[in-house]
Amino acid sequence: MHLRLISWFFIILNFMEYIGSQNASRGRRQRRMHPNVSQGCQGGCATCSDYNGCLSCKPKLFFVLERIGMKQIGVCLSSCPSGYYGTRYPDINKCTKCKADCDTCFNKNFCTKCKSGFYLHLGKCLDNCPEGLEANNHTMECVSIVHCEASEWSPWSPCTKKGKTCGFKRGTETRVREIIQHPSAKGNLCPPTSEARKCTVQRKKCPKGERGRKGRERKRKKPNKEESKDAIPDNKGLEPSRETPEQRENKQQQKKRKVQDKQQKSVSVSTVH
């Protein structure tokens, strides 16, 4: 009798546990399927589902759909990720994807950074920059063409020749200018920064230490008057140079001719008397 009562007690207890577990699982399924229930939602979701993720977000958060394979999952973020722009509505804050050629954007019509191979100009991404602009490959933007700018010419330098300013008549003078703005890739090239031209000066003697090389050489070549007198050879007191046999024979013949001429003159005088 006691054994029969105990067995019935365990049967009834197991049946009650089974009914309770069924009611609990039914309640969990109902809560997951109900769209207004937020129990168990993670990451700032106000409402969610196991299959689609977040369905709505808490205040100030942005709702964005992320693609995972063939499936899109709702996510709530404090700011929109790169490639999306945020728009706030009364009932939801939403992230929308930028255009295909845009990396980051302010809204659907204004890009702030283009993807590789495109140049940014006035909020749009272009393959080539418009006329009058050039592409900056560093910033990937269309920028204005910059031409070279140079300063005014300096005054002409003193007339010089081989670094000297005296001791000559013709020399060279120069002037220079500086580059203020270097050109961009398509800008006009810079002009020459120096010029030189021939010049003439009034002849003037150089101070000591500035005389040119030619002037010093000329001074060395000009002898003094006393030195020139001393340089004249004095033949007095010099021994006569030795004569060659031919010179002696010529002198003897000249003497004979003179003697013969005198004899002829004397004979002619005697015949006249």
From Swiss-Prot:
Keyword terms of this UniProt record: Disulfide bond, Glycoprotein, Heparin-binding, Repeat, Secreted, Sensory transduction, Signal, Wnt signaling pathway
Subcellular location: Secreted
Glycosylation sites: N36
GO BP: blood vessel remodeling; branching involved in labyrinthine layer morphogenesis; canonical Wnt signaling pathway; limb development; positive regulation of canonical Wnt signaling pathway; positive regulation of non-canonical Wnt signaling pathway; positive regulation of Wnt signaling pathway; sprouting angiogenesis
Disulfide bond annotation, renumbered to this chain: C41-C48, C45-C54, C57-C76, C80-C95, C98-C105, C102-C111, C114-C125, C129-C142, C148-C190, C159-C166, C199-C206
UniProt biased composition (Basic residues): 213-223
Single GO MF annotation: heparin binding
Function noted in UniProt: Activator of the canonical Wnt signaling pathway by acting as a ligand for LGR4-6 receptors, which acts as a key regulator of angiogenesis. Upon binding to LGR4-6 (LGR4, LGR5 or LGR6), LGR4-6 associate with phosphorylated LRP6 and frizzled receptors that are activated by extracellular Wnt receptors, triggering the canonical Wnt signaling pathway to increase expression of target genes. Also regulates the canonical Wnt/beta-catenin-dependent pathway and non-canonical Wnt signaling by acting as an inhibitor of ZNRF3, an important regulator of the Wnt signaling pathway.
Family: Belongs to the R-spondin family.
Domain topic, free-text comment: The FU repeats are required for activation and stabilization of beta-catenin.
Protein name from the UniProt record: R-spondin-3
Species: Bos taurus (Bovine)
Encoding gene, per UniProt annotation: RSPO3
